[in-house]
UniProtKB/Swiss-Prot annotation:
Catalytic activity: ATP-dependent cleavage of peptide bonds with broad specificity
Subunit structure of this chain's protein: A double ring-shaped homohexamer of HslV is capped on each side by a ring-shaped HslU homohexamer. The assembly of the HslU/HslV complex is dependent on binding of ATP.
Annotated residues for binding of Na(+): G162, C165, T168
Broad class of the protein's primary localization: cytoplasm
Keywords annotated in UniProt: Allosteric enzyme, Cytoplasm, Hydrolase, Metal-binding, Protease, Sodium, Threonine protease
GO function terms (MF aspect): metal ion binding; threonine-type endopeptidase activity
Source species, domain of life: Bacteria
Primary gene name: hslV
Protein name: ATP-dependent protease subunit HslV
Organism: Saccharophagus degradans (strain 2-40 / ATCC 43961 / DSM 17024)
Function: Protease subunit of a proteasome-like degradation complex believed to be a general protein degrading machinery.
Annotated Gene Ontology cellular component terms: HslUV protease complex; proteasome core complex
Subcellular localization(s) per the UniProt record: Cytoplasm
Annotated GO biological process: proteolysis involved in protein catabolic process
Length: 179
């Protein structure tokens, strides 16, 4: 059975801000099932922002597990991500989940993968999902050649991804942390 999937999630850190944004399209195979899904949210007392790409039900399971890890480790992002990754590798049910998480707080931006990896990307730029490569290319160009704020870079880059990726639309959810 096919899963609901297809999205673009982008995280940009610049100055004293980190922003994660995502589109709202949910696809089942070649069909758009929903256009206004919220794939980005705030976690742990509004100190962490997170976005997901991949199977929708799988991602919600991961959100719940990740939030529980944040609570258990007093909001320590890296520790919570590593503990979730450990569970992901050892738990039979979790190993079958097909999703990626992009998570960030004032100190770090991380990708938690379906293989149980925790990756801190270069330049604190994260792009995941079907339109991730398009959004990442646009964001890198804007980071290197403009003085735009992080939120503006996310908006413009998601817009470009939405123009070229059939699994990405222009209904964005964007969350921002200032520190």
């Amino acid at each position: 059975m096919e899963q609901y999937r297809g999205t673009t999630i982008l995280s940009v850190r610049r100055g004293n801000k980190v922003v994660i944004g995502g589109d709202g399209q949910v696809s089942l195979g070649n069909t758009i099932m929903k256009g206004n899904a919220c794939k980005v949210r705030r976690l742990y007392k509004n100190q962490v922002i997170a976005g997901f790409a991949g199977g929708t039900a799988d991602a919600f399971t991961l959100f719940e597990r990740f939030e529980a890890k944040l609570e258990a480790h007093d909001g320590q992002l890296v520790r919570a991500a590593v503990e979730l990754a450990k569970d992901w590798r050892t738990d039979r049910a979790l190993r079958r989940l097909e999703a990626l998480l992009a998570v960030a707080n004032k100190d770090a931006s991380l990708i938690v993968t379906g293989n149980g990896d925790v990756i801190q990307p270069e330049n604190d730029l994260i792009a995941i999902g079907s339109g991730g490569a398009f959004a990442q290319s646009a964001a890198r160009a804007l980071l290197e050649n403009t003085e735009l704020e992080a939120r503006d870079i996310v908006e413009k880059s998601l817009g470009i991804a939405g123009d070229v990726c059939v699994y990405t639309n222009h209904h964005f959810t964007i969350e921002e942390l200032s520190f």
